[in-house]
Amino acid sequence: MTTTFIKAVEIWVPTANRTKLTLKTGHYGELDYFERISRGMQFAYDEGLPGKCWAAGHPLMLKDLGNSYFKRGEEAMTVGLTSATAIPHFVGNDLAAVTVLFCGDNAHHVGAIELWHAPAGDPQMALYDGYFGRAEKFEFSARHTQFSRKVG
């Protein structure tokens, strides 16, 4: 069996009246318990990770699922999830979906996920946020790297 750093993926979409997000689809691998918990949930604007991502209008990352606004923190930690990254998708100004990537690392596997950003008018893109788990050298390198336009 192959073990990957990304353990689960969810796609949340607005309800017909656009007041909440509902789970459209998800891939949970062997995380049946977490899938069952997730299937019945909905998130209002600015609620939980999908809702907060909707409100922020840009990707968000949680590196501690148990001590945050993450609604399924205890369940996530029970199945070995260590971080979550939410990415909004827009059509014009309207939210089309929020993708949530769940990651998990342990003593035998190392992985990282990064969010990069270049502020308007800034020619350099730099690390905005990242979860590196045990990849300390990689984290140091990422935090001290910038990319010019069309480079990297």
Predicted features along the sequence, with ranges:
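Interdomain signal-transducing alpha-helices
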Residues: G57, N93, W116-P119
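Regulatory sensory and allosteric helical modules in signal-transduction proteins
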Residues: N17-K71, P123-G152
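Short N-terminal helix-loop-first-beta-strand/juxtamembrane motif that initiates sensory/input modules
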Residues: T2-V13, H109-Q124
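Short hydrophobic/aromatic beta-strand element in the GNAT-like acyltransferase core
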Residues: A8, A86, V98
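A short, aliphatic-rich beta-strand micro-motif
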Residues: T82-F90
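Short loop/turn motifs at secondary-structure junctions and domain boundaries
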Residues: M41-A44, E75-L81
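Short beta-strand-to-loop transition segments that serve as allosteric relay/switch motifs
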Residues: V98-N106
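Flexible loop/coil segments at beta-strand boundaries within sensory signal-transduction domains
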Residues: F90-L95, A107
